[in-house]
From Swiss-Prot:
One of its GO terms (cellular component) is cytoplasm. Binds ribosomal protein uS19. One of its GO terms (molecular function) is ribosome binding. The lineage of its organism: Bacteria, Bacillati, Bacillota, Bacilli, Bacillales. The gene is rimM. It comes from Listeria monocytogenes serotype 4a (strain HCC23). It is found in: Cytoplasm. Pfam families: PRC (PF05239), RimM (PF01782). This is Ribosome maturation factor RimM. GO terms for biological process: ribosomal small subunit biogenesis; rRNA processing. An accessory protein needed during the final step in the assembly of 30S ribosomal subunit, possibly for assembly of the head region. Essential for efficient processing of 16S rRNA. May be needed both before and after RbfA during the maturation of 16S rRNA. It has affinity for free ribosomal 30S subunits but not for 70S ribosomes. Keywords: Chaperone, Cytoplasm, Ribosome biogenesis, rRNA processing. NCBIfam families: 16S_RimM. The PRC barrel domain binds ribosomal protein uS19.
Amino acid sequence: MEKMYNVGKIVNTHGLIGEIRVIATTDFPEERFQVGNTVYLFEKNSKKPEKLIIRSHRKHKNFDLLMFEGFTGIHQVERMKEGVLKIKEAQLTDLEENEFYFHEIIGCTVVTTDGEELGEITEILTPGANDVWVVKGSDKKEKLIPYIADVVKEININDKKITIEVMEGLLD
């Protein structure tokens, strides 16, 4: 089976006409959830994904509201709650220089410019102006590393290694 990547989690239905409420896990919701695009639904207790074609997409508060072709009522989409939406690897688009997909960053080892290994990136937070990487060290403690030019000095995706410069107070 072709490699697939998460683009959203279905958290609830919305209204009565078959809309679902999605928390996007992609930096490109407008692109991923474009009308006519295909996504794959992985339901909690199902082994096989369901192919869905997006019929409509709109933003509502902090959610993306989606409707799929062939689904016209709440009773048809209630089962989708807690499902995960994915796309195939072939659907990924090329990024600009120094832009990376989350799956490329998660799992990378973080080292300082002095050569000290801090741990592995386990999660990426998106609180606002810049992403924040959660790095778990061998001591099981989490360190938060902002993805900014003053801190992140080199990203080597092939070697899964990221070099950072530790600013004063960053690891305290």
